[in-house]
């Protein structure tokens, strides 16, 4: 049994990256590292007896930290479910490619994307574009994220990360809590959604994820 890792960097990866990875596993003869393109590497890693999903997740973070320090290269990593045999390798590659795409699109603040932990991002990625557009119009009408400044969206994202805790969010943003409340009230005035309420917060978060997804799809189609 094995795991397939897919590593991607925003800059071209040279031989240094491969050498650093090989040095990270000096006694593992059955590790295979293959360039996919100038920006991606695939690595086939044999699963040891007793290896857990947490071990694999930690390994991905170890690779990220090591490459950052020793190869001066920042990477994001997706990995597959456990591969029982090599016949399942094509399916595993599809898993990692999907995990990397969904991860970068919906969880860009993260660096590791397990295929089996994509959450709601995988569901949204499979929705038809027309259904997404209908949902956005139902929620926002003619209002889009462009009507909200980047600072407000960043504050909202931090607010969600802190489980709708106003005091903690304000502290982390070095912002007076009344300023944060004012921004949340402005969003409510524009959208009708009170982000201090869990249901409205979830609706807004999903809507923003869908907006980002549609924008990404349109950017790809214009390339």
Language model feature labels by segment:
Residues 1-223:
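Cytosolic nucleotide-utilizing catalytic cores of signal-transduction proteins
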